[in-house]
A protein has these predicted regions:
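Patatin-like phospholipase
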Residues: 1-65, 73-427
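Catalytic cores of secreted/periplasmic lytic hydrolases that degrade extracellular macromolecules
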Residues: 68
Length: 427
């Protein structure tokens, strides 16, 4: 069982076929910053056009964490993946739905002001304790640290825009008025406990506020106050949290995870580059590359443990995980918090997901067929399909200097071998 395919043997699918009429299908979306949202939109567009018998705006349940919460809330409100691509990736369409990246990087002026007001009192207290000889330098620094803002950017513009989007005709900002279950996961700052907004007892919070709480990454955005408590990014506690859906008698769960560690040993032609300098090993890229790989590995290890646990606790539920190829230098080289290359990244996610579907076609057919879901082979095999109108080749901060014909041939050969391996596994 691999992280990308948690399905049981084909014989198990056949034995369940008689009891899967009217199968219930759920969608779980992990976080990953702006890069994660962009990747998930591109991947969902590829899945939407390829999977016949499933509507992503009419799933039987949604769970979203952090950036995945934005996407899940939109889908639950009837916004198709293509509509979200138009609004966020291409920035065209109706003004009400248009999502401009500037709303995510508005300075948290009110937070700055509130902390600045504390500074004179903290300085006076520190000076007094130093004069009395009762405080060390470390204690003084810790005390003055209270004046530092808890976030660089403000959540308010994000919440206000989402409230406007979800207040449009046919949509709602109220969990209780949705036709289907939506769960947005945040983390209680004071206890570290999971906050599953949308479940009974947690559904009196506006969807727009729950989304901002779920995506309040400490350091970037201030904690979001709801009632008497403060909440931060749900990814601090969970990577996917698909168990919310598994406990609701869901038969099939589609999971999307945008952040994976990079396998730098796959293709030596993919040389790491920082500016014009070639970096033969990730460690030579310094803190940025090492930190990125470490963060991705930490997040993904939790996901792997969770997926293994789901298979044990819910053996009768099929789970299909979609994520970037661990050997993909484009996704590892992209800035997790960048919006500037969103068209190229979305197109890359769209095309790489289509490749993933082609590689896993037989295994996915065996999983989906008992649930009444088919794969549109003509659509999947159409080489002319594109997601956005303008999609130049993405050039991240580090990349292979000049991918030659041999490199391209090796990548194509790798894809063929992957498909052969998948075919043998399901034969």
């Amino acid at each position: 069982m691999t992280p990308s395919d948690t399905s049981p043997p084909a014989s198990a699918h056949a034995s369940r076929a008689t009891r899967r009429k009217g199968a219930r299908v759920g969608l779980a979306l992990a976080g990953g910053g702006p890069l994660g949202a962009i990747w998930e939109i591109g991947a969902l567009c590829a899945l939407e056009e390829t999977l016949v018998g499933i509507a992503f705006t009419r799933m039987d349940g949604y769970v979203g964490i952090s950036a995945g919460g934005f996407i899940a809330a939109g889908l639950a409100n009837g916004m198709t993946p293509r509509q979200m691509c138009t609004a966020f990736i291409e920035n065209v369409g109706g003004d009400d739905d248009l999502i401009h990246p500037s709303i995510f990087v508005h300075p948290a002026w009110s937070e700055y002001a509130a902390r600045l007001k504390m500074l004179p009192r903290l300085v006076a207290q520190a000076a007094w304790r130093i004069a009395l000889g009762t405080a060390s330098g470390v204690e003084v620094i810790e005390r003055l640290g209270r004046a530092l803002p808890t976030g660089v950017f403000s959540n308010a513009p994000i919440e206000a825009h989402l409230r406007s989007v979800f207040s449009a005709p046919g949509r709602t900002d109220d969990f209780r008025k949705l036709d289907r279950r939506l769960v947005l996961v945040a983390t209680d700052l004071d206890t570290g406990a999971v906050a599953p907004f949308g479940l009974p007892g947690w559904d009196d919070v506006p969807i727009s506020r729950a989304v901002t709480a779920s995506a309040a990454l400490p350091g970037l955005y201030p904690p979001v106050r709801i009632g008497e408590r403060h909440y931060v990014d749900g990814a601090l506690k969970k990577t996917l949290h698909a168990r919310v859906l598994l406990d609701q008698d869901i038969d099939l769960v589609l999971c999307l995870n945008p952040l994976v560690p990079f396998d730098a040993t796959y293709a030596p032609t993919h040389t790491v580059r920082l500016g014009t300098d070639a970096i033969p090993r990730l460690v030579e890229g310094g803190l940025p590359l090492v930190a990125s790989q470490g963060f991705r590995s930490l997040i993904h290890s939790r996901l792997e443990l969770g997926m293994a646990g789901y298979g044990l606790s819910h053996p009768d539920v099929d789970i299909a995980l979609f994520e970037p190829d661990h050997r993909d230098p484009e996704m590892f080289g992209a800035n997790t918090f960048s919006y500037s290359a969103r068209r190229q990244l979305a197109e890359h996610a769209y095309q790489s997901t289509r490749k993933n579907l082609r590689t896993r076609r037989r295994a996915l057919h065996a999983m989906f067929q008992p649930h009444g879901i088919a794969i549109a082979d003509k659509v999947l095999d159409d080489p002319t399909r594109r997601l956005v109108t303008y999609a130049p080749r993405l050039t991240p901060a580090w990349h292979d200097a000049a991918p030659d014909r041999l490199g391209g041939a090796l990548r194509r050969l790798g894809g063929v071998l992957d498909e052969l391996q998948s075919s043998l596994a399901t034969a």
